[in-house]
């Protein structure tokens, strides 16, 4: 019995689904035993019954039932009792034969009835339009997951306007998004509010773009836009700005606390309403609620600091708060001039600058900055130095890097850790102060350096969750000027954290995709050797690898051998050779060794030296013999030929001693055995003599 389209449509309802299931199951059930024949009864004729529903016009005229004889109504009580008894018996006997669409559903428990989620609370002092607006967006437009943010405490107010109230809603699809935004704009227009909807495609505009897209796809065939490319139609986000309600354009006089006139101007009054409509994926990607909540939190913290509610020593900077992990310090580049970030709020009075000063004692400075250029400076001098001078900040950060790298491991861990009371250490307070108001690229490079340093020290607090927060912050702040090397370092840090469960590996893969997405959004290639090598190198450095990690490693190794990528650098090849040699994966070791010839590139002296050193360290006669026979011959045929350096000669001698232990002694005594040809024919004796003959001009 096949399912008809009508049955499939009916399966959308839970009750219909259950009834349809009974209908299908009944066809496979065993036949029921025949029921006993009931005693025949003489029943009175029943009133005619029809399932036809008359129209209003037909209801106005007498029905056919009204013209029927009222004999059934005049039957004696005895006949009615017999009819009721017969009906009851018939129902009991043939209840199972009633079709499902005539059966009465059981009453539903109140807890199973779907109730719409509650609407967000309206803040006090909101405009009168706020409550009907929330109801319209929820009930009429059908937006899900409504959230209302009260951003009226942000000081100074954002560019959207003063006293911002922001409503968020999730649309079910792209079409639902545009239709809902268009209806919202028209609804507001009927109430005298002119709203501006950024990202909205009007009805005619959307149809025109769809026609053009279909025509272009027909002309291009399969060579059109790739999946996921920007087609100019899919936005996923519409910002409906209602403007500032209650705005006054009257100029007024401002007076200070003493009643003295301090100026004239237009007051910032009224409330700005903004409705953010997004699809579910776009809302998760942008995370605007988190962004605006962070802006509000930082504004309140800044106001509390100015008012003296927080201690000055607990200084943190957002979004430049240090969170980190690391590998090796790298120098920070100076911009060469003092630039200010446009998204920063600067203090305009000396009193506010004093409130933001770093409160560290001279003893702490002497301890933390021992051996630095500014070790004997006073706290006020350090604070003035770190005020706005970008070059001085960069120089101080470089000295801090050198200082941290010179410390023993225990002291370095203490420098990047929190104190017992939960406050940052003196080193971290100075670091936070130094990166404040730096250009975005330099600030992020400094923060990533601290992250690498903490990861190299295996700091317990710098785990995968903290690294995920840092990556999310980079996405929100738009770290567009960070170099590609820093993103590759982030990938190394992600997979260098040991994970023993499949869930942890999946989280690592998700974070790595966030980093790769940031690279892709900058227009850079993502499937390149630096990215693939960073992931493989980090995965192979972890000892315990769950099945998900092994599967991920296999996928990246397939990319290494099959993807069409540009030729890797010398350092990338050497790192892969080292990591495969450490794990004794010699087949993959030699596959990496052949990458340069595939790109018609010459292998360098460093690469040959690395191969000979790794083979000699393995101390295996067969491997040493094969390496000498293959690699030495290839070395002579490189264009131009590879010269034998002192380090390479030392590694080659070690390989020859492993392949033929007597070759060295025979080669040294060859002058005494010049008449004996058997020693001259030995393969590695000739190689020893050749190498020492070439070492004089190749060293």
Swiss-Prot record:
DNA-binding among keywords: no
Sequence segments annotated as region (Disordered): 46-95, 310-341
GO biological process: mitochondrial gene expression; mRNA stabilization
Listed name of the protein: ATPase synthesis protein 25, mitochondrial
InterPro entries (alphabetical): Atp25, NT_sf
Function: Probable mitochondrial mRNA stabilization factor.
Family note: Belongs to the ATP25 family.
Organism encoding this protein: Neurospora crassa (strain ATCC 24698 / 74-OR23-1A / CBS 708.71 / DSM 1257 / FGSC 987)
Pfam families: RsfS
Subcellular location: Mitochondrion inner membrane
Coiled coil: none
Membrane topology reported for the UniProt record: Peripheral membrane protein
